[in-house]
Amino acid sequence: MTVDTKENEKEKEKEQLGISGKTGTNVLREVLQFKVVYWGPGESGKTTNYFRLREKFDGLKLNRGYSIQTTDGRTLWQDSIRLSFYLNLEAIKFNIITQIVTATGQERFLSTREYVLDGADGVVFVADSDSDKLEQNKRSFRELVSFTSEKNIPFVIQLNKRDLEKAIPIDEFKNGLGLPRFENYGDGTQVVYPTVALEGDSVRKCFEDLMMLVLLNFFSE
């Protein structure tokens, strides 16, 4: 019997998330659709996260995605692939479709960013580890909090570009944004997710942990 190693690897990845493309014995009762926004200052790595997710969830893509760019080649708005996977909850199987959108980090497009957040179920805040960009991180984070504070939208914080020579210490970053000094919240999610999106480091874990928060938020309403 010939074994397709690449296909098996994809199946193992799906199983780790509780994902399955098989119907099994459970009855598919409901389709859940969520929207996840990647938010942060300009050039912090939001679009890079998007491309890494496309690679890591290649077997679950529903569409190829598309983007809108400014005349200088910067991303204005990008609608990622929709990801489809299953969640087994007792005798019910949910088909979960997640739309991923990246918001521009350019400050002159603030109104566009607020529009992108409309209908969001979760947010990944992507900060830049460059020590010279702490103020940009703080401004972008304040904007995010102001838009989400009354909407009960869960978010996780990703500190990208940890491979920079002058990367800001994580404790200094936490202090600048007014975050807790401990590493994990009571639900197990991290206060800050150190990442190197170019290499794909921790990009998937950050996304998966946010999706758990989104699902918990949905089922607790």
Regions found by a protein language model. Give the residues of each.
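Conserved catalytic network of the ASCE P-loop NTPase/AAA+ motor domain
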Residues: G73-L76, N88-K93, E114-G119, S146-K151, ...
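Conserved Switch II/interswitch segment of TRAFAC-class P-loop GTPases
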Residues: A103-Q106, G119-S140, S149-E150, R162-A167
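Canonical P-loop GTPase G-domain recognition
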Residues: E165-E221
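Conserved beta-strand/loop subsegment of P-loop NTPase cores
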Residues: G122-F125, T148-R162, R181-P194
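Charged helix-capping and loop-helix junction motifs
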Residues: N137-E143, D171-N175
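Amphipathic alpha-helical interface segments within eukaryotic helical scaffold
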Residues: R108-F109, E114
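Switch I (G2) and immediately adjacent beta-strands of P-loop GTPase domains
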Residues: G65-R108
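Conserved G1/Walker A P-loop phosphate-binding module
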Residues: T2-T71
